[in-house]
């Protein structure tokens, strides 16, 4: 009987120790999996942010070239051609907006709507960028008066290009910018408020 009790106690101890060892192994496997997943996720995020930054740099390059051409068209007084170029140029800016918006004042100089500018400044004085040019071309049906704004827009986009080249694109910046843009689309662009 004592032998059976001793045998049972040894067996129970062995089972408990084996069970604890198995749990430790599972914990170690779990930690290793978390570390591997974490490393993999970080690498994937780095690849995604690097690709997105490259995409935005390409969009800003296109934006600058197209805006320079647009400024020349405006200075030549070719209203119809300028009106054709305008929405195409805007698309390149919109695609870079999740990062461009992070440059505060520069985004305001390039892409601020009149309604928002008036709300903040109580005057049109100092308002410039795409929407200033747009207002003159469509409301006054002319390119006259847009030349200085077009030149300034080119300068602002050159500054944007320089800043985009040096910005660190983090997952937070990429996601926050995208969410902000989606909110803007939902509250302004879809409803037509973007054009006010």
Model-derived segments and spans:
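Non-globular terminal segments
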Residues: 2-13
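Bacterial lipoprotein signal-peptidase II cleavage site
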Residues: 6-7, 17-32
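Mature extracytoplasmic or organellar-lumen-exposed domains after removal of signal/transit peptides
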Residues: 33-196
């Amino acid at each position: 009987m004592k032998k059976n009790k001793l045998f049972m106690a040894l067996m129970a101890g062995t089972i408990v120790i084996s069970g604890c060892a198995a749990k430790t192994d599972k914990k170690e496997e779990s930690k290793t999996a978390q570390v591997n997943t974490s490393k993999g996720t970080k690498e994937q995020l780095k690849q995604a942010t690097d690709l997105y930054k490259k995409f935005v740099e390409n969009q800003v390059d296109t934006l600058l070239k197209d805006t320079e051409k647009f400024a020349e068209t405006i200075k030549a007084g070719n209203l119809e051609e300028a009106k054709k170029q305008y929405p195409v140029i805007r698309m390149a800016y919109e695609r870079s907006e999740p990062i461009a918006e992070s440059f505060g004042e520069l985004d305001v100089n390039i892409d601020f709507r009149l309604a928002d500018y008036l709300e903040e400044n109580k005057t049109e004085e100092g308002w410039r960028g795409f929407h200033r040019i747009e207002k003159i071309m469509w409301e006054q049906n002319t390119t006259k008066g847009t030349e200085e704004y077009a030149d300034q827009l080119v300068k602002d986009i050159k500054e944007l290009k320089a800043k985009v080249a040096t910005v660190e694109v983090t997952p937070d910046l990429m996601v926050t910018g995208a969410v902000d843009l989606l909110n803007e689309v939902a509250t302004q662009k879809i409803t037509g408020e973007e054009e006010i």
